[in-house]
Swiss-Prot record:
Topology in the lipid bilayer: Multi-pass membrane protein
Keywords of this entry: Cell inner membrane, Cell membrane, Cobalamin biosynthesis, Magnesium, Membrane, Transferase, Transmembrane, Transmembrane helix
Organism placement in taxonomy: Bacteria, Bacillati, Cyanobacteriota, Cyanophyceae, Acaryochloridales
Function: Joins adenosylcobinamide-GDP and alpha-ribazole to generate adenosylcobalamin (Ado-cobalamin). Also synthesizes adenosylcobalamin 5'-phosphate from adenosylcobinamide-GDP and alpha-ribazole 5'-phosphate.
Cofactors named for this entry: Mg(2+)
Keyword NAD: no
EC identifiers of the protein: 2.7.8.26
Record organism: Thermosynechococcus vestitus (strain NIES-2133 / IAM M-273 / BP-1)
Subcellular locations according to the entry: Cell inner membrane
GO biological process entries: cobalamin biosynthetic process
Gene: cobS
TM regions (residue ranges): 8-28, 36-56, 58-78, 107-127, 131-151, 187-207, 222-242
Name of the molecule in the record: Adenosylcobinamide-GDP ribazoletransferase
């Protein structure tokens, strides 16, 4: 139980900017399996802020921009940075140089464009979203896609934090936190079956697409998986709620 608590704290410390007491020991090895639960915490916070903005009658476009800004602040832009680096890498035709480009901390044109598309999709979708509870599902499923990418596909670098997540995970055993969370949310915040199935389909397809382009995954592509899954889920849920 102590190890699970340290893994959970490690997930909070690594994947968010939420404060953790320095007196609390954290453990990164094995922390990745708790990513969807981190999404639950962040999604719940965003849902609460959305309720407050609605109560204050803040115009929908402004409220959506505030939510996305808070979304970025809570994660420190960790996943968006990975999506940008991945986009820059995929813009290079030479597959051997892609990892080198992705490791460059400087943002390129394709990375900036990818970030703009992701943020625009999120802001515009949120401005039309009817049920704020969907935010919880979006953040949970986005991180479940990352867990699937870690479990299913090879890691392309010999070292790095992503390598720790890959080598310390024991799958399929370590899917139990994700499975439990999806089961709980299905009862507490039920989604229409079609939307849930589409979300699960994205969880399979998006990591597979990056695998086909890169030959595996890196920490950057894990971030890209989270961001694109979240953005496309928001679009799908918005369209589904409007139809």
């Amino acid at each position: 139980m102590k190890s699970l608590w340290q893994e959970w704290l490690g997930a909070i410390a690594f994947y968010t900017c939420l404060p953790i007491s320095p007196r609390w020991p954290i453990q990164l090895a094995g922390a990745a399996k708790w990513c969807p639960w981190v999404g639950l915490v962040l999604g719940g916070m965003l849902w609460g802020v959305q309720w407050l903005l609605d109560f204050l009658q803040v115009p929908s476009p402004v409220a959506s921009a505030v939510l996305v800004a808070l979304w970025l602040a809570l994660t420190g832009g960790l996943h968006l940075d990975g999506a940008m680096d991945t986009a820059d890498g995929l813009a290079v035709r030479d597959q051997q140089r892609r990892l080198e480009v992705m490791a460059d901390s400087r943002a390129g044109a394709f990375g900036v464009m990818a970030a703009m598309v992701i943020l625009l999709l999120k802001v515009t979708s949120l401005s039309s979203l009817e049920k704020g509870s969907v935010l919880v599902w979006v953040l949970v499923l986005g991180r479940l896609a990352q867990v699937w990418a870690i479990a299913r596909y090879p890691y392309l670098k010999p070292q790095g934090t992503g390598q720790i997540h890959k080598t310390s995970g024991v799958f399929p055993r370590d899917f139990w936190p994700s499975g439990l969370l999806v089961l709980l949310l299905s009862f507490l915040l039920p989604l229409p079956l079609g939307q849930l199935l589409f979300g699960l389909l994205l969880i399979l397809l998006i990591p597979a697409w990056f695998q086909s382009q890169l030959g595996g995954h890196t920490g950057d592509s894990y971030g890209a998986v989270v961001e694109w899954t979240e953005a496309l889920l928001l679009v799908a849920f918005t369209v589904g709620s409007a139809s």
